[in-house]
């Protein structure tokens, strides 16, 4: 079974968490694209969606799913998003697609965060996947120097601008033993908008697609 087929399995299982008449928060990325496509099959049962990126917004609108601004809605019952890595506490690395800031905001504004992924994303220790850090452009070099002091190797994601008009430093070389602590340390660097660790507020449920079927995992 291919990774893409496993992603589809996880996306299909996530549909079971969608309550009729609600607004669904949607993340960004290849796994979420499968979920959005499936959401289109039940669009008459939901009120609409709040999207974490221009790319997801375009996909939702192409399926005629109403898209709301976060400021126009209250607490969102459910947020569905993928991950680049998850540990067994459902602390995540996200942001490979560059939408980490809006993803983190919508996840925080949601009652339940269901993460969907293929089984390869579950790891014992976070950090093999480079950790994205979104930075204000003028602060990029300064932030990079501070990341080096924390033991990371930041690489400027050239030619990429976030939906917020900022830049990304993909940070290599981190073995992240205390994800929540590092998340706070990085976010305290002046010029950092946010980083791709979702550890202070981890996912509530992890749905993994695997050759054996769907695995549902809750935090340790």
Swiss-Prot record:
| EC number of the protein | 5.3.1.6
Q: Which Pfam families does its entry note? A: Rib_5-P_isom_A (PF06026)
So what does this thing catalyse? aldehydo-D-ribose 5-phosphate = D-ribulose 5-phosphate
The alphabetical list of record keywords is: Isomerase
Query: Which molecular function GO terms apply here?
Result: ribose-5-phosphate isomerase activity
List of catalytic residues: 103 (proton acceptor)
Q: Name one GO biological process term.
A: pentose-phosphate shunt, non-oxidative branch
Q: Per its UniProt entry, which superkingdom is the organism in?
A: Bacteria
- Cellular component per GO? cytosol
- Top-level class of the enzyme under EC nomenclature: isomerase
Residues bound to substrate = 28-31, 81-84, 94-97, 121
Q: In which pathway does it act?
A: Carbohydrate degradation; pentose phosphate pathway; D-ribose 5-phosphate from D-ribulose 5-phosphate (non-oxidative stage): step 1/1
Please describe the quaternary structure of this protein.
Homodimer.
Task: Report the protein's function.
Answer: Catalyzes the reversible conversion of ribose-5-phosphate to ribulose 5-phosphate.
What family does the database annotate?
Answer: Belongs to the ribose 5-phosphate isomerase family.
Q: Report the protein name in the record.
A: Ribose-5-phosphate isomerase A
Origin organism lineage: Bacteria, Pseudomonadati, Pseudomonadota, Gammaproteobacteria, Chromatiales
Gene from which the chain derives: rpiA
């Amino acid at each position: 079974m291919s990774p893409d087929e496993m992603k589809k399995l996880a996306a299909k299982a996530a549909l079971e968490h969608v309550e009729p008449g609600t607004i669904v928060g949607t993340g960004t990325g290849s796994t979420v694209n499968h979920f959005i496509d499936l959401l289109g099959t039940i669009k008459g049962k939901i009120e609409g969606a709040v999207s974490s990126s221009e790319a997801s917004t375009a996909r939702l609108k192409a399926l005629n799913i109403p898209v709301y601004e976060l400021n126009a809605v209250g607490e969102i019952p459910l947020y569905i998003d993928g991950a680049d890595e998850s540990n067994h506490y459902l602390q995540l690395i996200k942001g490979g697609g560059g939408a980490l800031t809006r993803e983190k905001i919508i996840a925080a504004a949601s009652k339940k965060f269901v993460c969907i992924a293929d089984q390869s994303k579950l790891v014992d220790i976070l950090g093999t996947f480079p950790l994205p850090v979104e930075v204000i452009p003028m602060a990029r070099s300064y932030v990079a120097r501070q990341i080096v002091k924390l033991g990371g190797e930041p690489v400027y994601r050239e030619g990429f601008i976030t939906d917020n008009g900022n830049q990304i430093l993909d940070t290599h070389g981190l073995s992240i033993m205390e994800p929540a602590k590092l998340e706070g340390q990085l976010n305290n660097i002046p010029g950092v908008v946010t980083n791709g660790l979702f550890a202070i507020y981890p996912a509530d449920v992890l749905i993994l697609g695997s050759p054996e079927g769907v695995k549902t995992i809750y935090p340790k």
